[in-house]
Regions:
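PAPS-dependent sulfotransferase catalytic domain
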Residues: 79-170, 192-207
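Short, well-ordered beta-to-alpha junction loops that form the rim of enzyme active sites
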Residues: 12, 78-79, 115-117, 183-185
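The conserved 3'-phosphoadenosine-5'-phosphosulfate
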Residues: 36-44, 142-146, 152-154, 172-223
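Aromatic-acidic/polar surface patches that form glycan- and anion
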Residues: 2, 12-13, 68, 157-161, ...
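Short glycine-/polar-rich loops that comprise or flank the Walker A/P-loop
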Residues: 72, 107-111, 177-178
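Surface-exposed, flexible loop/turn segments at secondary-structure boundaries
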Residues: 17, 38, 81, 120-121, ...
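PAPS-dependent sulfotransferase catalytic core
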Residues: 1-72, 217-219
Length: 223
């Protein structure tokens, strides 16, 4: 299905992107945002969808079919490290921003939601724990792993998170794009208000409190 318009949740790992993406997807009319362009996810999806390996154009078309709701809205998540790789793999005409060329090719009439987290220390700890335990999301009732802390690796991820956020900031400034800015801290404490602000930005209907989809994954209490 070819989308009429689209949006991208531009983010870094452990910023609440699944919470925002699942809530938007569960409305039934705000696309089906997911990590379609994560390196491992991309390989798995390409195999599942029968898309030739390395054919980015064919893969994008397959994403359109999976991520577009019947009203023609396409939604996707995009981490900075995946975006950085994608834009480096393109060879646009001279003077054309490679990242913007990819966005225009993959996301028709795109709008951008910039999701970030103020507390970088907690972000780094959460990222490290998820990477070590493989628990990127906790279902209700699921116990979180508690591996022995490795401070040096946590610090490295805090710094990498800062670099990735700066990457998005600089790219938005360079391209003149003005995204809808969302903070994880606000999303975690007042999901309805934040999601409705995003829906308004996307020119989509608001949610009533009774229609707010349940949370699929619970928050890790200390990260």
């Amino acid at each position: 299905m070819e989308p009429v318009r689209s949006y991208v949740i531009c983010c870094v790992q452990r910023t609440g992107s699944w919470l925002l993406a699942h809530t938007l997807a569960d409305t039934g009319y705000a696309g089906r945002p997911s990590d379609y362009f994560d390196d491992a996810e991309r390989e798995d999806h390409a195999r599942e969808w029968g898309v030739p390996a390395g054919d980015l154009t064919a893969y994008v078309r397959a994403v359109w079919d999976k991520a577009t709701t019947p009203n023609g809205v396409l939604g996707s998540k995009l981490m900075w490290n995946d975006f950085d790789w994608l834009r480096s793999s393109l060879r646009p005409p001279a003077g054309t921003d490679a990242g913007l060329a990819f966005m225009r090719m993959a996301f028709p009439d795109a709008q951008f939601v910039w999701l970030r987290r103020q507390d970088k220390v907690r972000q780094g700890i959460s990222w490290w724990r998820a990477a070590v335990t493989g628990q990127w999301g906790l279902r209700p009732g699921q116990q979180a792993g508690r591996p022995p802390p490795e401070v040096e690796q946590m610090v490295q991820l805090v710094r990498f998170a800062e670099q990735c956020e700066d990457g998005w900031r600089q790219w938005f400034a360079a391209t003149g794009i003005q995204p809808c800015e969302v903070l994880y801290e606000d999303l975690a404490t007042d999901r309805l208000t934040v999601v409705n602000a995003v829906l308004e930005f996307l020119r989509l209907p608001h949610l009533d409190a009774d229609d707010l989809p349940p949370v699929r994954y619970r928050q890790q209490a200390d990260a």
